[in-house]
Amino acid sequence: MLLENALAYARYDDHPVSPGHVLILTQRHVADYFDTTLAEKHAMLELIEAARLLLNWEYAPDGYNLGINCGAAAGQSMPHVHYHLIPRYQGDMENPRGGVRGVIPDRQKY
């Protein structure tokens, strides 16, 4: 475990997209973000900020992607709500324009 508070915790992803990829999860088992309490949302955001500071120091990324997959149609593969905090590095992909919009390639450019 990387970081923890009363309602959430952060750990490195077992299958990282990039060096330093962190997952932020609720302590309580909740399948969907929209079923979390306001306190759990705040607890996860607190850890996102703390993890970002840690990653800035350890990995010095050039940017971040932050996201949640809600439901199978959105790519959720783990039935426990979690944020992905993904460090990004200059040159780590050919064309990062559009960021998370790239999940649907035809919508990446706008």
Predicted regions and their residues:
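HIT superfamily nucleotide-processing domains
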Residues: 1-110
